[in-house]
Amino acid sequence: MIISHSRKFVFLKNRKVGGTSMEFFLSKYCSGEDVVTPIGEEAKFLPQSLQAEFGREIRFQNYRSFFNHYSGVKARDMLGHDLWAQYYTLTFERNPVSKVRSLFYFNTADVSEEGDPVADFLDTTYPGYLSDAFRYISNDGMIVDLVGNYDRLNEGFETICRRLDISFHGEIGFQAKGWQSAGRKEFTIGPTLRQEIADAFALEAEFVPWMAIEGTRPICSASRLAR
């Protein structure tokens, strides 16, 4: 997470959207008064194009009481509602099906093909685990100015950089990781699992229309409370 007082923006970091690389890019434009939370073990998952720079330019500072994947509601309460309203608040999301598939390939990167890795994954992981709604939706509705689309990353960052008066040269320096390698088990998502994912991400789809899963209609209430 980043709270930049110098450029007046807040970046909330969701999961499985390349958030570490986004955080790295934005942190380079932060000053000494800004909050930049540590990313810990996530540093080893930075794309190779950024690993050489990591640790030399990014500064983890002023982060006491803040955490990397922090709830937007808690961050707003700590920052103050007045400043939150003044700052440009942003985060990124991705299609829920793509998000679950990404987690499967990430978690099973070193798993043997023996047995059924897909079944094992679904036995231990439920779709709602990846819901990040509580980071940018509160009981009062959406609390951020922008939920960028991971699949339109460069377009989103062009808008962000223009708003923050940051130089942008067409990309932020990384591309989505390809966890699936030749010969690995394919993660097939059938109608039943698609519906389960749609139910788990019903709240997100209510506020971020492009997160709705085509061909499904969530049967659970989308009014669950944000944490």
Please give the residue ranges for each predicted region.
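Membrane-interface amphipathic segments in extracytoplasmic regions
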Residues: 1-227
